[in-house]
UniProtKB/Swiss-Prot annotation:
<comment type="similarity">
    <text>Belongs to the herpesviridae NEC2 protein family.</text>
</comment>
<dbReference type="GO" id="GO:0044201">
    <property type="term" value="C:host cell nuclear inner membrane"/>
</dbReference>
<keyword id="KW-0597">Phosphoprotein</keyword>
<protein>
    <recommendedName>
        <fullName>Nuclear egress protein 2</fullName>
    </recommendedName>
</protein>
<keyword id="KW-0812">Transmembrane</keyword>
<keyword id="KW-1043">Host membrane</keyword>
<dbReference type="InterPro" id="IPR007626">
    <property type="entry name" value="Herpesvirus_viron_egress-type"/>
</dbReference>
<keyword id="KW-1133">Transmembrane helix</keyword>
<feature type="topological domain" description="Nuclear">
    <location>
        <begin position="265"/>
        <end position="276"/>
    </location>
</feature>
<feature type="topological domain" description="Perinuclear space">
    <location>
        <begin position="1"/>
        <end position="245"/>
    </location>
</feature>
<comment type="function">
    <text>Plays an essential role in virion nuclear egress, the first step of virion release from infected cell. Within the host nucleus, NEC1 interacts with the newly formed capsid through the vertexes and directs it to the inner nuclear membrane by associating with NEC2. Induces the budding of the capsid at the inner nuclear membrane as well as its envelopment into the perinuclear space.</text>
</comment>
<feature type="transmembrane region" description="Helical">
    <location>
        <begin position="246"/>
        <end position="264"/>
    </location>
</feature>
<comment type="subunit">
    <text>Forms a heterohexameric complex with NEC1.</text>
</comment>
<keyword id="KW-1048">Host nucleus</keyword>
<dbReference type="GO" id="GO:0016020">
    <property type="term" value="C:membrane"/>
</dbReference>
<keyword id="KW-0426">Late protein</keyword>
<dbReference type="Pfam" id="PF04541">
    <property type="entry name" value="Herpes_U34"/>
</dbReference>
């Protein structure tokens, strides 16, 4: 049963480390389970750290400490071309690095720096500070700087009161939002109930208010249709009046021509011939 738990712990620590540090398949090298079972003071994994990248070191250390119920240690080492980090479940076999952990630590070639959770807590400006991050920077020549960045308040009581104020403000805003959502849902339910039963009065006014947004577009479309039909009727009436006038004038002209033709036909024409 203990071996099964160790295997689960092994897989959990490896997956959590890759997830938290966002490691690729070529960024780390893990130690086999059989070798760890024979000598548990070997590192579980060795990681090649990138430059100018913020690693969430305190979060990973806290997770390892919670899973293993022990005091894990991360050892930083300058290999000459990069900085590696070896993750140990226990203290390493040989003491590597006796330097005190500070915010900025200079590592020369083959020098090591061992970091524990107590070292991180000692660097934090306050108990309620955010998780400390680790950044590797190139210094000069073949030296590197291991920098630990921690943010936190200098006054704990002021920080706690500020957190309470922010939390209460968010809670009040959340309650107002929840109440407004409940009111809108109740209004929709009442309006749908009124529309189904066809009731009028005060409940009908609520239904009209609730459905005003839905029917506004329909009313606008109906208004435009009425306006269009009215304008087309006015245009048609104007055209019909113009056509009537033209027809009357043409009829009068034809009647005048016909009257002239009749008069000319009834008038006798003088006889033509030689005068005696």
């Amino acid at each position: 049963m203990a071996n099964v738990l160790k295997e689960k712990m092994y897989d959990e620590l490896l997956s959590a480390t890759c997830r938290i540090l966002k490691l690729g398949s070529h960024d780390y090298r893990m130690t086999e389970r059989n070798l760890l079972s024979k000598n548990p003071k070997f590192p579980l994994c060795d990681i090649i750290l990138k430059l100018d990248y913020a690693y969430n070191l305190e979060y990973l250390l806290s997770l390892w400490e919670h899973v293993t119920k022990q005091e894990p240690r991360f050892v930083f080492k300058n290999t000459g071309g990069a900085v590696s980090m070896s993750c140990y479940l226990h203290a390493p076999v040989k003491a590597e690095g006796h330097h005190a952990v500070r915010e900025c630590n200079i590592l020369r070639v083959n020098e090591c720096l061992t970091v524990r959770m107590s070292d991180i807590v000692a660097m934090k400006p306050s108990t309620f500070a955010v998780f400390t991050k680790c950044i590797i920077r190139r210094n000069r020549d073949e030296t590197y700087v291991v920098e630990f960045v921690a943010f936190g308040p200098e006054n704990e009581s002021e920080y706690i009161s500020l957190l309470k104020a922010i939390f209460l403000k968010k809670c009040s805003m959340g309650k107002q939002h929840l109440e407004s959502n409940r009111f809108c849902q109740g209004l929709r339910r009442r309006s749908s109930h009124v529309l189904e039963k066809g009731q009028l009065g005060s409940s009908g006014e609520i239904a009209n208010k609730a459905s005003a947004v839905v029917t506004s577009q329909e009313s606008i479309n109906q208004f435009y249709e009425k306006e269009k039909s009215f304008l087309s009727g006015v245009k048609f009436s104007r055209l019909s009046e113009r056509h009537c006038r033209v027809a009357i004038v043409s009829i009068c002209f034809l009647l005048a021509l016909y009257f002239c033709y009749v008069l000319l036909k009834k008038t006798p024409t003088p006889a033509s011939g030689p005068v005696v």
